[in-house]
Swiss-Prot record:
UniProt GO cellular component terms: cytoplasm
Protein name in UniProt: Uncharacterized DapA-like lyase VNG_0444G
Gene name in the database record: dapAL
The entry's keywords: Cytoplasm, Lyase, Schiff base
Keyword Cytoplasm among record annotations: yes
InterPro entries: Aldolase_TIM, DapA-like, Schiff_base-form_aldolases_AS
Entries under SUPFAM superfamilies matching the protein: Aldolase
Entry EC number(s): 4.-.-.-
SMART domains with a match to the protein in the record: DHDPS
Lineage: Archaea, Methanobacteriati, Methanobacteriota, Stenosarchaea group, Halobacteria
Residues forming the catalytic site: 58 (charge relay system), 121 (charge relay system), 147 (proton donor), 175 (schiff-base intermediate with substrate)
Family indicated by similarity: Belongs to the DapA family.
Biological-process GO terms, alphabetical: small molecule metabolic process
Quaternary organization: Homotetramer.
Superkingdom field: Archaea
């Protein structure tokens, strides 16, 4: 358990903390699912020292997968690294019915917890959001974590709604990607029973400063050793070294943002010797110029 870094929530049975990458979903050249390589990526980051894995987050391209493909991803990752670190599986969908189905499957194959993104496309009020999470929590016998990313879902959770969600017995934490530091700080202060996970590479060390126990980092998909080093420095009480690592994370994050949305992570993995295949359409990869620039950036940062 952490020494100087924030502790997980008192009501979190998994005690989630540390670095929890939102692992990638690998595809073959024709964009068909490559479950084996998906599992290999989870293995890669676990062997690098991360503290948990989160399949089927944004980096896992979950909205672009069929329901059966999503189930295969969770099974593959649990089979590969389950029992070594917590596996918290993304199960969110626009409908409560589909979310429950994904959650039931994840729990049945051994996922340690489920991550439920707020439903998207249709706007929801707080009452609907709370009922959604209640129904998911009632369907599975494992902890449930809220994934709060209003920039993608269009649905922001108020602090009042979060307070109502916290009354759900098995709701154990929040992965916050809102980048709203005042909201996050107030949420952490109000709910010591919940584990909070900082969900943006722009706010890893700052997230720890406001009380987040864990870090869900896209950069950790590419350079897990960098983000693990940041967390370990912080937990050892070496804030100066942790902030220096955060500065490097900022530079890596900027490099990964070259070109089309989310193309940088898989391209960087390929440059570092791990081929996760293409993004699934309509997402597209880097062109030759952007790939060359990314390669130069990573080399300058000592990652190649």
């Amino acid at each position: 358990m952490p020494t100087h870094a924030p502790a997980p929530g008192s009501g979190d049975p998994l005690g989630l903390h540390g670095v929890v990458p939102p692992v990638v979903t690998a595809f073959d050249a024709d964009e068909s699912l490559d479950a084996d390589t998906t599992a290999d990526h989870a293995r890669m980051v676990v062997d690098a020292g991360v503290h948990g894995v989160f399949p089927l987050g944004t980096n896992g391209e979950f909205p672009l997968l069929t329901p059966s493909e999503r189930d295969r991803v969770v099974t593959a990752v649990v089979d590969e690294v389950g029992g070594e670190v917590p596996v918290i599986a993304g199960v969110g969908a626009p409908s409560t019915r589909q979310t429950v189905a994904h959650a039931e499957h994840a729990a049945s194959v051994g996922a340690d917890g489920v991550v439920v993104v707020t439903p998207f496309y249709y706007p929801l009020d707080g009452t609907a959001a709370v009922e959604h999470y209640r129904r998911v929590a009632a369907a599975v016998d494992c902890p449930v974590y809220v994934y709060h990313i209003p920039s993608k879902t269009g649905n922001e959770l108020s602090l009042e709604t979060l307070a109502a969600l916290a009354e759900i017995d098995t709701l154990a934490g929040v992965k916050d990607s809102s980048k709203d530091v005042p909201w996050l700080g107030q949420a952490v202060d109000a709910h010591p029973e919940l584990t909070f996970l900082a969900g943006s590479d722009s706010l890893l060390a700052p997230g720890l400063d406001v009380g987040c126990a864990g870090l869900v980092s896209a950069v950790a998909n590419v350079a897990p050793e960098l983000v693990v080093g940041l967390y370990e420095a912080y937990d050892e009480g070496d804030r100066e070294r942790a902030r220096a690592r955060q500065s490097t994370v900022y530079e890596v994050r900027a490099a990964l943002k070259r070109g089309p949305y989310m193309a940088g992570v898989k391209a960087a993995l390929g440059l570092r010797g791990f081929d996760a295949g293409p993004l699934r359409s309509p997402l597209r990869g880097l062109d030759d110029d952007d790939r060359a620039a990314l390669e130069a950036d990573l080399a300058d940062l000592g990652l190649l």
